[in-house]
């Protein structure tokens, strides 16, 4: 047995499923998950000594690549002064100033510890500010594991929420309305059915949890207009897209102004950090200045703030996003060319430093139904064959891939060459 197999066997006796987040268990592709020894730049190194070109990037945070010296040094320096104080620090102020400067729609920001905390807090704030209970989310969009967001979409344009996980009471989920991503008619139908009851829409501007599905040109502006028409708030979940699709996020890339924004992943530089913020009048409703309660023992802790501050200062340097786009575009085009040579039907979506690989005969993939029609079994085979080639993709047909500026054009070309060999055997 390999070291990964031995560790996985031991882990399953001690940790549910052997992992601390389900997708890591390779349930979406089968087999034994890799246990990682270290990472540097664009590469992961497993406990058996094999190197992989990494397109998971810790599920998005590693936009600069692994073990970036500026972030590493900032963490070491901060740790020498203490790990946690439970009191305000200067770095929290500097971090808040940096975030609000980089994302102009955020007048104020509150730091938390995860993307889930950011989205659940933003929704509570929207409900408290509007005095309404219902929310709209979209089929295939994931916003963390808060109870009100673990809702399965049924057939049709509009579905009253049904819990997607045991342990979520139906009474919690009933206020969550599920609409179809990239379908404004389904959203209008929800508002017309509940015109005075919907507090907010929460949306991934690029749906990154049904692989990678960008918005149609009219979709995000249409959501803004509907929120304005019916008095609801628009929450854009930029946990994946923030500082990756563009410096000011997908909201800037697509030209839409939210009332609230949720951030995570890149904002922590690899440390556990989330944030939410937006309009000053809305944020003023948050405790201690307002009645909507939110708190966290480790929120704004000095290590995470130091890592995030260092990361965002690097990400803000000229040319970063142009490099991400160039590398991702080359990868997407190369994969399509290699698939065409092998007569493999393939769609590759990409935006900035995000991409999605779909085995499908369809011309395009624009919604949850398109994603579910893709050939998952072929993806599983593709994943494992690419792993043998030393390329680590997301171990699920429903998760986006992530590029970093640490990837070289040689890494991209080597990945395309590996895919060409794999396509020939599929």
UniProtKB/Swiss-Prot annotation:
Record's catalysed reaction(s): (S)-4-amino-5-oxopentanoate = 5-aminolevulinate
Alphabetical keyword list: Cytoplasm, Isomerase, Porphyrin biosynthesis, Pyridoxal phosphate
Biological processes per GO annotation: protoporphyrinogen IX biosynthetic process
Positions of post-translational N6-(pyridoxal phosphate)lysine modification: 265
Molecular functions (GO terms): glutamate-1-semialdehyde 2,1-aminomutase activity; pyridoxal phosphate binding; transaminase activity
GO cellular component: cytoplasm
Alphabetized Pfam families for the sequence: Aminotran_3
Signal peptide, first to last residue: none
EC number: 5.4.3.8
Pathway of action: Porphyrin-containing compound metabolism; protoporphyrin-IX biosynthesis; 5-aminolevulinate from L-glutamyl-tRNA(Glu): step 2/2
CDD domains per the UniProt record, alphabetical: OAT_like
InterPro entries: 4pyrrol_synth_GluAld_NH2Trfase, Aminotrans_3, Aminotrans_3_PPA_site, PyrdxlP-dep_Trfase, PyrdxlP-dep_Trfase_major, PyrdxlP-dep_Trfase_small
Localization per record: Cytoplasm
Gene3D superfamilies referenced in this protein's UniProt entry, alphabetically: Aspartate Aminotransferase, domain 1, Type I PLP-dependent aspartate aminotransferase-like (Major domain)
Entry cofactors: pyridoxal 5'-phosphate
SUPFAM superfamilies per UniProt: PLP-dependent transferases (SSF53383)
Subunit structure: Homodimer.
Record HAMAP family: HemL_aminotrans_3 (MF_00375)
UniProt record similarity statement: Belongs to the class-III pyridoxal-phosphate-dependent aminotransferase family. HemL subfamily.
Protein name (Swiss-Prot/TrEMBL): Glutamate-1-semialdehyde 2,1-aminomutase
The species this protein was found in: Salmonella agona (strain SL483)
Organism lineage: Bacteria, Pseudomonadati, Pseudomonadota, Gammaproteobacteria, Enterobacterales
